[in-house]
Amino acid sequence: FLAIPASNDFETTPILHDTMVAILPKDHPMADASVFPLEQLPHENFVRLMEIEDYEFNRLLDHYNIHPEVTYDTTSDFALLSMVEAGLGISIVHSLLIKPGRYRVATLPLNVKQSREIGIAVKKGFLPSTITQLFLQHVVDYTKDMGEITVIRH
């Protein structure tokens, strides 16, 4: 699995779009808002997920010249969600990270659209084994039932 576009060494099959969303503590004043305005970020305590390469998030902030006040950094998705749940700040994450009902956080779409396309890749010129082909088909079928995530069908 990878974010598309990928290296030309791979043949990719897009399976879904993963949008960025704001996550806030349930008791946050904006928890019931219809969208989260990016312009609000510098006025919030921000919990940042330290990923080696989070191009989408950094590109989004750079594009809108927004510089959040990073209160906490973590490398753990679970720690980030727990910190937001505990009221230590807010965050911006990919929607695939959020499992409904697992954490008591409010999830809001951003006032600007930012998403990534996720796909399955196999090496170009490589014929996947039968079991790999069955797995790939299972993944495509499974993503059809993922609710709010937009599934790409070809």
For each feature predicted by the language model, list its residue ranges.
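Beta->alpha turn/N-cap motifs
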Residues: 1-6, 25-26, 76, 92-97
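Short beta-strand-centered segments that line the small-molecule binding cleft or hinge
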Residues: 1-20, 80, 84-88, 104-108
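Short gly/ser/thr-rich secondary-structure transition/capping motifs
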Residues: 2-6, 29-31, 101-103, 143
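Flexible hinge/capping segments at coil-to-helix
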Residues: 9-20, 24-46
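Generic preference for hydrophobic
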Residues: 12, 22-23, 46, 92, ...
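Secondary-structure junction motif
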Residues: 44-64, 128-136, 146-152
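Hydrophobic hinge/microswitch elements
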Residues: 52-106
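A late-sequence structural motif
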Residues: 107-149
